[in-house]
Amino acid sequence: DRRFLTREIEPNVSTIIETNTIAKFTCEGVTNDKEQNDIGEYLIRAYKDAKEIGSLLPIEKYDFKAFTEYLNSLTLSGQLTLESDYWVEGTLPEMKKIVKQAVMMSDKYAVVCTNPPYMNKLEGQLKKFVIEEYKPYKGDLFSVFMYKNFDYCKPDGYSAFMTPFVWMFIK
């Protein structure tokens, strides 16, 4: 396709946003839909300390479109409190970014192109996470990353990895 580069194709590139500063999703006088609030609480739990784990996080598929519409519809109702004002000014904008990130991390793609990490010594929280979530691949972060990126790819999609001969020396 000779016109590929002239099309408005947006790559899905992002830095991971954590939810460590968000204590809870619900806010009295603002959030009132239990189903949507449950999605918000899930996202807060899922992205706690997320920078340590990065794109390896398994994000469940929810109706994030409906959740985004819910976030866009939220307004202050009733008595204005310090908590509700803080929530609307601070938490709400963060949740809009987080749901966009969740959409990217729960979708499947026609093309996945990346540069896997080349470290085989895992420590701390990352080591614990890899053992729990990716046990068959726990020996090397490179293997875990390759597996996860095949998961991001559609069945008939393409995967491209920047992989020098390091793979020959994986233990």
Which stretches of residues belong to each language-model region?
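SAM-dependent methyltransferase catalytic region
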Residues: 1-171
